[in-house]
Amino acid sequence: MDRVSLFHGYLPIEPADRMRRLKELEARVYSENQTQLFIETPYRNHKMLEDILKTCRPQTKLCIAANITCEGEFIQTKTVKEWKGKLPELNKIPCIFLIYK
């Protein structure tokens, strides 16, 4: 099966709704071989990252692409487990988050 990438824009702001949506997106990663892309308002990036790390499986891959095409560009992929405890500073910079297997 070919890999498909889907862009979802902003996820819900309410924590319970956001975590439920993250679980749905991660399920599609594994059941449909899809990469899920989404963004967050820059001042909420850290909260989004925390929620991803709390919600997603340890083996799920998370790519964080921040400040793309700008000075200080940051693009890195690790598993959820590898990201825990080693969070980049993402406050007030545009980011795209991708989850996949």
Model-derived features: positions:
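A contiguous loop/helix-start segment that scaffolds small-molecule binding in enzyme catalytic cores
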Residues: 31-101
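Class I SAM-dependent methyltransferase SAM-binding "motif I" and its flanking Rossmann-like core
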Residues: 1-28
